[in-house]
A protein has these predicted regions:
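N-terminal [4Fe-4S]-dependent radical SAM core
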Residues: 6-85, 102-110, 122, 129
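Short acidic, gly/pro-rich beta-turn/loop elements at beta-sheet edges
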Residues: 21, 95, 151
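Core AdoMet radical
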Residues: 82, 86, 102-177
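Short cysteine clusters
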Residues: 91, 95-98, 141
Length: 177
């Protein structure tokens, strides 16, 4: 069976200790795995589904959180830090090793790409919802579960305009390929 495109490393037990071929490079506690996949995550996803019942992004991000264990998706439901807002189902980069779309004969993708194009209203609704209460809030476009966000600017720009009307001094991040 082919392994999905996750990060892997060698592990060895030596004198009852685990050793890995890796180097610790980031001291940002916000991405510590202990903060994610908690027992109450299902309940938090259901709460946001109830708060935003007609928003397709909530369903998509709930799946990203519960199936693929995506940290930026989970942050929406935990109402903290950086929350990703996938916006583009298409891409023009054709990256070797794309984590959201692989040819059928290749290895499985570690997450599934968004299959719809969110409306400006859906994007703005998620952004505003997150910014209302999240400490150190950031909203970002260009997640692993989407294509190239710059191909969705006709939906992202009006959404950002709505968000900026309510939250002018806001951190937004656009990751382009």
């Amino acid at each position: 069976q082919m392994l999905p495109l996750y990060g892997y490393t060698a592990v060895v037990i030596y004198k009852d200790e685990l050793y890995v071929a890796a180097m610790y490079t980031d001291e940002n506690d916000k991405w510590d795995p202990a903060h994610y996949n908690t027992r109450n995550l299902h309940k938090l996803v259901k709460r946001v589904q109830k708060d935003l019942p007609d928003n397709r992004l909530v369903e998509h991000l709930g799946n990203c959180s519960l199936t693929w264990h995506c940290c930026t998706a989970q942050n929406l439901f935990y109402r903290r830090w950086e929350a990703g807002i996938p916006s583009s189902p298409v891409c023009n980069a054709n990256c070797f090793g794309c984590i959201s779309l692989q040819p059928a004969e290749c290895c499985p993708s570690p997450q599934s790409r968004i299959k719809f194009r969110p409306t400006p209203k859906e994007i703005a609704q998620i952004g505003i919802y997150h910014l209302e209460t999240a400490p150190d809030a950031i909203i970002s476009f260009g997640q692993g579960c989407e294509g190239e966000p710059s191909l969705a600017v006709d939906n992202i720009v009006p959404a950002i305009e709505k968000i900026r009307k309510k939250y002018p001094p806001t951190y937004m991040n656009l990751k382009i390929i």
